[in-house]
């Protein structure tokens, strides 16, 4: 029989999504929001906060152009944009105690650009493979990347380019003028629902329109500032409690990791015949951490 418990607000790493047309201000907005997160976490100045942010740049080095706003950390990821590359980068950053926020700019490249999921699937189809089977294979790869983002202990802000359209609209002077709208993210449908909050960034004004919010947020922010980051962090963490993992939960995690990575013998050797559930929470958490480190070493050797 299931056990019911009272719903409680739990502390968790925040995942935010910003999408919009090229030059709408996604990168700048993400860095400002990330800065607010860090200020709220560490109680530091705006200048100091950038030291605890890392930007993963897929935009051909454009992410470094914002260096004038602060000394954030920077990693460039180049084509081919295989999902495994991003997973490895995130896993490395997860172990860095000085980093609080990861900005991924942008996730679109791992979906529709050179070496991304769509191109890999097209190549597999051209070699005579079954299209349905190929989708299963590459959907699994994409899902593994999304899982790495969502399961990261860091706060993560993700950007994506938007498929856009330009239409004639009446401006504030009563004249017709072209306006570019970001219609939908150039990414697998539904990704925005995986995140805690989503902004559609307007190209002309850099205004952030809220499409998914944390309770208490307004519908429009113009422009993005560190204060917006502080607000989001405060709304998400106010009266929240630290989540406590249970022994059975960690045991299931260990079983899954060891099975997926052919590490069952390692776990059995570490247990010396003891059942997983007989370990204390401290012992089983250490085993999980050691197992993850061994998996990373194994992947590097490949």
At which residue positions do the language-model features occur?
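Interfaces that engage single-stranded nucleic acids at replication/repair/recombination sites
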Residues: 1-20, 24-26, 30, 35, ...
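Phosphate-binding/switch region of NTP-binding enzymes
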Residues: 19-23, 147-231
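Conserved inter-motif catalytic segment of the P-loop NTP-binding fold
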Residues: 21, 47-140
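Post-Walker A helix-loop "phosphate-sensing" segment adjacent to the P-loop in P-loop NTPases
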Residues: 35-53
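Hydrophobic helix-cap positions at the C-terminus of alpha-helices
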Residues: 37, 93-96, 149-152
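Helical mechanochemical/support elements of P-loop NTPase systems and associated helical scaffolds
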Residues: 82-85, 131-145, 149, 183, ...
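Glycine-rich phosphate-binding loop used to anchor ATP phosphates in small-molecule kinases
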Residues: 99-109, 135-166
């Amino acid at each position: 029989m299931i056990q019911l418990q009272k719903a409680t607000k739990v502390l968790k790493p925040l995942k935010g999504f910003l999408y919009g047309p090229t030059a709408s201000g996604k990168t700048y907005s993400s860095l400002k929001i990330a800065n607010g997160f860090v200020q709220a976490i560490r109680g530091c100045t705006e200048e100091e906060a950038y030291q605890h942010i890392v930007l993963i740049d897929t935009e051909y080095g454009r992410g470094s152009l914002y260096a004038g706003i602060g000394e954030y950390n920077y990693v460039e990821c180049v084509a081919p944009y295989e999902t495994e590359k991003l997973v490895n980068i995130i896993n490395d950053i997860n172990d860095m105690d000085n980093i609080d926020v990861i900005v991924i700019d942008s996730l679109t490249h791992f979906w529709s650009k050179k070496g991304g999921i769509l191109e890999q699937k097209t190549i597999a189809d051209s070699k005579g493979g079954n299209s349905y089977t190929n989708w299963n294979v590459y959907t699994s790869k994409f899902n593994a990347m999304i899982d790495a983002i969502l399961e990261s202990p860091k706060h993560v802000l993700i950007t994506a380019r938007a498929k856009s359209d330009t239409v004639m609209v009446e401006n504030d002077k009563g004249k017709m003028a072209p306006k570019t709208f970001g219609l939908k993210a150039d990414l697998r449908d539904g990704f925005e629902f995986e995140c805690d909050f989503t902004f559609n960034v307007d190209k002309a004004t850099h205004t952030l329109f809220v499409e998914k919010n944390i309770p208490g947020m307004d519908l429009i922010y113009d422009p993005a500032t560190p204060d917006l980051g502080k607000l989001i962090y405060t709304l998400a963490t106010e009266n929240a409690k630290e989540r406590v993992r249970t022994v059975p939960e960690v045991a299931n995690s260990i079983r899954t990791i060891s099975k997926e990575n052919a590490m069952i013998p390692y776990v059995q050797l570490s247990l010396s015949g003891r059942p997983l559930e007989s370990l204390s929470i401290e012992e089983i958490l250490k085993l999980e951490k050691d197992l993850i480190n061994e998996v990373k070493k194994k992947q590097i050797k490949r």
